[in-house]
Regions:
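Conserved SAM-binding strand-loop segment of SAM-dependent methyltransferases
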Residues: 111-123
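Conserved alpha-helix/loop element of class I SAM-dependent methyltransferases that forms part
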Residues: 45-62
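A short glycine-rich, Lys/Arg-flanked "PGG" loop and its adjoining helix->strand segment in the class I
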Residues: 151-163
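Hydrophobic alpha-helical topogenic segments used for membrane insertion/localization
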Residues: 2-23
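Conserved beta-strand signature within the Rossmann-like core of class I S-adenosyl-L-methionine
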Residues: 164-171
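Conserved SAM-binding loop of SAM-dependent methyltransferases across substrates and taxa
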Residues: 73-85
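Conserved SAM/SAH-binding beta-strand->alpha-helix loop
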Residues: 96
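A short acidic, Gly/Pro-enriched loop at the edge of an enzyme's catalytic core
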Residues: 124-136
Length: 216
């Protein structure tokens, strides 16, 4: 009886995961902040996929201007703000104002707001000037943008990157909006990027890219 109950529970969880994943593919949109906070701060998730993996290909950020698109509740941006140091600046943008508020609260608690700028805006039209960023970071967020606008979002990321800048994208398979690596490579090339490096481990990958014409 217990075995049957356990199998039934696993089956229900499996069906629930499939339903969430299918819905994420058919109706891409930002994850609600309450769910995002649980998902991004969950110790089990952080132990396997945390800021270290997300920023592995970003290089030394000391003194740089680094933008994260889709900050969520600020887990990755907090680490970025620490890494840029007092001589650098971290920036974050999210379309959800409550996510930006959570991020501001998190960074304020760690004394990092003096080196951080936040904005509530669409990833397709960001408030920063052309070539103003050294790095742009996107973590499990491109899939939240409707399919027809993903290349446009990548081009907007390229717009704010300076001539030596680097775009770093990380995807985590359990995320309902996961984009597979081959598809991500195609999207980047369509947006005018060339691939610099790829890091992979089970369930996740990170890819870095530069705008076409840059010396890699």
């Amino acid at each position: 009886m217990k075995r049957e109950w356990g199998l039934g529970l696993l089956g229900a969880l499996g069906l629930g995961f499939i339903a969430v994943r299918v819905n994420g593919k058919l109706r891409p949109k930002p994850m609600p902040v309450q769910i995002e906070q649980f998902f991004l701060t969950n110790p089990l998730r952080v132990s396997y996929f945390g800021p270290r993996d997300a920023l592995r290909l970003a290089g030394n950020l000391e003194g740089l201007r680094v933008l994260e698109i889709g900050t969520g509740v600020g887990v990755i941006l907090e680490e970025i703000a620490k890494r840029v140091g007092e001589g650098g600046q971290a920036f974050g943008v999210d379309i959800q104002s409550d996510a930006v508020a959570k991020t501001e609260q998190r960074l304020s608690q760690h004394g990092l707001m003096s080196r951080t700028g936040l904005a509530t805006a669409n990833a397709l039209e960001m408030p920063w000037t052309d070539g103003s960023m050294d790095r742009v970071i996107m973590v499990a967020m491109l899939g939240e943008i409707p399919t027809s606008h993903r290349v446009e979002a990548l081009k907007e990321a390229g717009r704010v990157l300076n001539r030596d800048g680097k775009l770093v994208i990380t995807e985590f398979w359990p995320d309902p909006h996961f984009i597979a690596l081959p598809k991500m490579v195609r999207l980047l090339r369509q947006a005018g990027f060339s691939i610099v490096d790829v890091y992979q481990k089970p369930l996740l990958y990170s890819i870095s890219a530069k705008k076409e014409g840059q010396v890699v």
